[in-house]
Amino acid sequence: MPTAAAAKSTAAKSTPPTSNQKIAHARAAEPVLVKGRREFFKYRDLGVDQASEGAMRAQVMMASQGMSRPTGWHYHECEGQFIYMMKGWVDLQFEDGRTIRVEEGDSLYIPGYLRHNEIRTSDTMEILEVSVPGKMGTTPCEPPPGFKD
């Protein structure tokens, strides 16, 4: 009489659905720098946009000097944006009136189309940024009521 373990090993095995997505492995020793949406950052592409066929984008944003002025109110055309602060800090204002400082080791999720404004940063900064989908537009907008640009 077969044991439960033997019966389990002979059970039909599931076949996963197929996907054209690929593995992305970005080596720190061979960074791929790309043009980004802000001139005061350097952007390191992590290969996720291409590997996921545009489903997601991951990059590291690096600054070697603090912001001289706020970015201005804007929103991103995406489902969502996630950041993880690897080094330094950034202060962000949100349309609901909150100002949040994201410091080293902190993370923040920003829903798509939520108005916000980066107002200050540390002198050096590195942020892992992930967006869904990979293509994320940035649209300048008017400040929410009660805020100045």
Q: What is each residue range found by the language model?
A:
Residues 60-64, 75-92, 130-133:
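Short, conserved beta-strand element in jelly-roll/cupin
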Residues 56-60, 107-109, 122-141:
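A short hydrophobic beta-strand segment most commonly corresponding to one strand
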Residues 95-97, 120-121:
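Conserved catalytic-core motifs of eukaryotic protein kinase domains, centered on the activation segment
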Residues 96-113:
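Short acidic-glycine-tyrosine-enriched beta hairpin
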Residues 1-65, 140-149:
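A short, N-terminal "cap"/entry segment at the start of jelly-roll beta-barrel domains
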Residues 113-114, 119:
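Short, surface-exposed secondary-structure boundary micro-motifs
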Residues 51-56, 66-82, 96:
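A short beta-loop-beta micro-motif enriched in histidine and acidic residues
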